[in-house]
Amino acid sequence: MAKRIDVSGLNAYYGSFLAIEDISMTVEPRSVTAFIGPSGCGKSTFLRTLNRMHEVTPGGRVDGKVMLDDENLYGAGIDPVAVRREVGMVFQRPNPFPTMSVYDNVAAGLRLNGKYKKSQLDDVVEKSLRGANLWNEVKDRLNKPGSGLSGGQQQRLCIARAIAVEPNVLLMDEPCSALDPISTLAIEDLIGELKERFTIVIVTHNMQQAARVSDRTAFFNLAAVGQPGKLIEIDETERIFSNPSVQATEDYISGRFG
């Protein structure tokens, strides 16, 4: 079930360095929210705080709240691994497990989280590959290495792997940056379908992509190199691209900087 994200007063650190400062926003369920902004503005760091991947980096920590419906993901006793089951992630470069088959890539998370009969795994693998619009392309090569697929197919395999464990939220960190235009279009079409089931947040440097796929867009910026990134504004995507409230947003979108 897709869930709502409410972030309030969030600061993220690497050691003593404040990477992002005082971020507050709401991400509605069954929607696509895009994060845009210049390199180094903290949008990917913020994305990673939404499933506690930020903590994997030595010295990574946050203060503030990230609520998934009524649950504080940083509350006492909350297991970060359990958080990452609820809030899945797709990374910038396709990263299928290189020694695993297509089938085993999709089934990996299920096997890690519990015991399943072969028939149950078969059903979930097919459902997930269909959900990622990949089934018809790989159904006859399920036992072949996932690394043998094309780049676009590998990224859809990673999406299938992420949705197999039925998360509530799907985070995507520049999922098309390493792909050709045809593969990018396939991923964008897939995002439009997946938002019917999941809450989706995507980081992208491609503003045309943000305009095409998202319902809401958040613009991040920083005052100078070495300063923390901040959320400048978030609004309906059409409004952000046609009539933003902040001059810096308009300057970035129009190409005056960034």
Curated annotation (Swiss-Prot):
| Predominant place of localization | membrane
Cited SUPFAM superfamilies: P-loop containing nucleoside triphosphate hydrolases
Compartment(s) where it occurs, according to its Swiss-Prot or TrEMBL record: Cell membrane
Q: Name one GO cellular component term.
A: plasma membrane
Q: Which Gene3D superfamilies match?
A: P-loop containing nucleotide triphosphate hydrolases (3.40.50.300)
- What molecular function terms (GO) are annotated for this protein? ATP binding; ATP hydrolysis activity; ATPase-coupled phosphate ion transmembrane transporter activity
Print the keywords alphabetically. ATP-binding, Cell membrane, Membrane, Nucleotide-binding, Phosphate transport, Translocase, Transport
For the keyword Mitochondrion, the answer is no
User: Which CDD domains does this entry report, sorted A to Z?
Assistant: ABC_PstB_phosphate_transporter
The EC designation for this entry is 7.3.2.1
Q: Which domain of life is it from?
A: Bacteria
Classify the protein's membrane topology as the record does.
Peripheral membrane protein
Q: Where's the ABC transporter domain?
A: 5-247
Please list the reactions this protein catalyses. Answer: phosphate(out) + ATP + H2O = ADP + 2 phosphate(in) + H(+)
Gene Ontology biological process terms in this record: phosphate ion transmembrane transport
Which annotated residues bind ATP? 37-44
As for family, the record states: Belongs to the ABC transporter superfamily. Phosphate importer (TC 3.A.1.7) family.
Subunit architecture: The complex is composed of two ATP-binding proteins (PstB), two transmembrane proteins (PstC and PstA) and a solute-binding protein (PstS).
Describe its function. Answer: Part of the ABC transporter complex PstSACB involved in phosphate import. Responsible for energy coupling to the transport system.
The name of this protein is: Phosphate import ATP-binding protein PstB
Give the encoding gene's name.
pstB
